[in-house]
């Protein structure tokens, strides 16, 4: 069982992929209040869940601190057409104050949309209703199979109940103000027959008011993610060719564009540290994955992930070299 580490307000929320806030230069700000997940999906790109063999720590951020820092980014980017996307490297539904978080974000001037990604495995009607009243505008629901046996296999979780998830879909569509985007991961050779079923179900249930109702995702292999035995990622050409076939067959939009979600470029927070730059840091906690540590820059303006750091104790001060800095997600190694 991974340890749960609470991120104090002395630890910047910009810099670490596992928690906090991510700005990728658009009007979307990713919000990551917690890293835990109840499922251990066999294709998970972030190796989440209780069966993870590479995670050593899970993180949780106090919701007041998260909202305070989020508002600063909104002010920097411009108080208009901002989307707060609660996505995490786990499942946001595990965050104890998810309703309070949605409510607080919805009250920030300039925030137009609050969306959330979830498998819905622990969602219930009471929580869905509360999220709707709090201001949640869209749920991106990861639904990868309708066949119960295959759904359990993909989730690698025997208690996962896809029929319950489908019932929740119906409730969301019929009884809440939340738009539903169904977002299956298509794993070639594994759930090929399930994707058309999911398309039919979504066409029947969902009439999204403001967004597309389907967003089929391409299975990819990630450095730290789980690899599905026997599954090989398609080329992007083959993937989009098949989406167009399904579009014609089911008369539904499947090839999506950022504009479909109102996504546009917006000024990005400066990246203060360049690749290969030497930086002084202080180790403040355990890292997300094994052999990592969580560190903060000497200036206190960014968090970073310190790799190859299993022997470095918490509290240590040292020089490190930045090896990655895209979108202010900083990875460094000891010098």
Cite the ranges covered by each PLM segment.
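Structural detector for short beta-strands of small beta-barrel domains
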Residues: 251, 269-288, 316-323
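Core AdoMet radical
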Residues: 45-66, 73-95, 106-123, 127, ...
């Amino acid at each position: 069982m991974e340890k749960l580490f609470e991120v104090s307000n002395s630890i910047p929320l910009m810099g670490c992929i596992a928690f906090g806030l991510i700005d990728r230069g658009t009007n979307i700000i990713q919000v990551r209040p917690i890293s835990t997940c109840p499922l251990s999906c066999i294709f998970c790109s972030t190796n989440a869940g209780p069966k993870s063999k590479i995670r050593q720590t899970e993180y949780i951020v106090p919701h007041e601190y998260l909202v305070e820092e989020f508002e600063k980014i909104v002010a920097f980017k411009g108080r208009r057409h901002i989307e707060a996307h609660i996505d995490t490297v786990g499942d946001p539904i595990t965050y104890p104050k998810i309703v309070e978080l949605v409510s607080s974000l919805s009250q920030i001037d300039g925030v137009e949309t609050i969306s959330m990604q979830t498998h819905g495995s622990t969602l219930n009607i009471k929580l869905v209703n509360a999220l709707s009243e709090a201001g949640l505008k869209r749920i991106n629901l990861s639904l990868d199979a309708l066949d119960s046996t295959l759904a359990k296999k993909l989730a690698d979780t025997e208690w996962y109940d896809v029929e319950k998830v489908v019932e929740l879909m119906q409730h969301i569509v019929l009884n809440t103000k939340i738009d539903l985007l169904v977002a299956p991961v298509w794993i070639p050779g594994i759930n090929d027959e399930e994707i058309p079923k999911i398309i039919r179900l979504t066409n029947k249930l969902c009439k999204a008011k403001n967004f597309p109702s389907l967003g089929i995702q391409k299975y990819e292999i990630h450095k730290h993610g789980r690899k599905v035995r026997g599954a090989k990622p398609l080329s992007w050409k083959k993937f989009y060719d098949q989406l167009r076939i399904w579009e014609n067959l089911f008369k539904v939009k499947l090839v999506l564009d950022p504009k479909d979600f109102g996504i546009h470029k917006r000024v990005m927070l400066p990246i203060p540290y360049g690749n290969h730059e030497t930086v002084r840091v202080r180790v403040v906690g355990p890292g997300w994955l094994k052999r990592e540590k969580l560190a903060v820059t000497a200036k206190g303006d960014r968090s970073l992930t310190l790799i190859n750091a299993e022997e470095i104790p918490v509290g240590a001060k040292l020089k490190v070299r930045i090896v990655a800095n895209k979108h202010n997600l900083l990875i460094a190694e000891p010098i």
